[in-house]
Structure formats: C-alpha cells, structure tokens
Amino acid sequence: MSTSIFQFLAEPLSSDVRIQIQRWSNADDVRRLAVMPDVHPAGLFCVGMVIGTQELIYPIAVGGDIGCGIAACRFTSEGSEITQRHLLAIFEAISRFIPIGRHRRADHPALPADLAQRPLSDPVLEKFKFHDGELQLGTLGTGNHFLELQIDQDQRLWAMVHTGSRGIGQAIFQFHFRHCVPAQFRRSALVADAPEGVAYLADMQWARDYAAANRRSIMQVLS
C-alpha cells in the first residue's frame, strides 16, 4: 500500500531529509507522512516529520522529549512599564527559581496528585518518577528549550516557555524502545494493541501530562 505524503515547506528539502522521507514512506504500516517547514534530520527520524500508522507504534518517531510544547501567559503590566532595573530583577529571579537542570531536594515542587497516583508501567519508571520526575518538575532543560519575555504589538507584556517532559520522557522512551520488535529499514516498532504497545501509550500519555504540568509550574513561578 502506498504512503500518502503531505509537504508544507518554506524552502527546498535537503538530500538527508529526502532520504529519510523515502525510507519512512516505505516502512511497515506507515500510511501517511507529513513534512513541516522546520524539518531537519535527527538520527533515524526527522524533527518536523509526522507519520500515521494503524497497527504499529514507532517510539523513535516520538522521541524522548514527549509532550514538548509552548505555553504563554500575559501579565497585567504593560511593556512600557518595564525598566532595565526591572528586567535585571526578573531574570535574577528566573535563574534562581526556575533551574535549567533540577531543583535542590529541599525545595522542589511536588508532583500533581493525578501524576503521583497514576502508575507507570514498570517499577524502574516509577522509581525515576518519584526521583528525577519530582526534582525536574518546573525546570526548563537545555537544547532549544527557552523562557522569554515578549511585548506584543499592543505593548502588552507576555512570558513564553518552551519545554517538555524532561528526563522522565527520555526514560520512558529508552525503556520501551528496548521492547520494540525489528521492522523494515532498521526501524523498531511496538504493536499498538499488544501489552507492550498499550503500556507505551499509557506511559506516553503520562509524560504528555507531566510536560503540561512542567509548563504550568514554571508559569506559576512567573505569576
């Protein structure tokens, strides 16, 4: 069965991206493939590429930064009210209360009750959840994650944060990737309705909810 390919592009594709598109369009159970304007290679998959399947799950296509996204909040202050002195104080507070890596054990926020009470699929992941998961809640991370202040066209002041599920998302990805079965072109997959696939989907949803809670925690500090 041929794969339907949809492209939303701002510039021509690189040869490396074209190779990935060709390979993934021929992978088992890939029915649809979409290419976004920011597409670029990232190992065995491309950031900015989306695949649609019916029976198989490819954890490598999701990656470890499960639930990565953006949140924004508007302040009551206007941009014109913020002086250089205010900015220095704001960024000093951000660097103090919103770590890049993890909180100190003594002052980290607790996991929301829903996340704490909802078990992950393996004791190894549960242990990680209550250690790194707690210590990294409300932290930014590295790479392309960011926290910035913005002023819109009406001079209103905003904060925007881009971050995801931190180390627990990576742990979930690595744990389940070991249970994948070989598929075409060195890709590894989980059968969606098999126990391993069901467990992965549940853990992935947990990580998505954690990522949203992580962004909310950061926004609460800013507010």
Regions found by a protein language model. Give the residues of each.
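Short polar/acidic secondary-structure junctions
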Residues: 39-41, 54
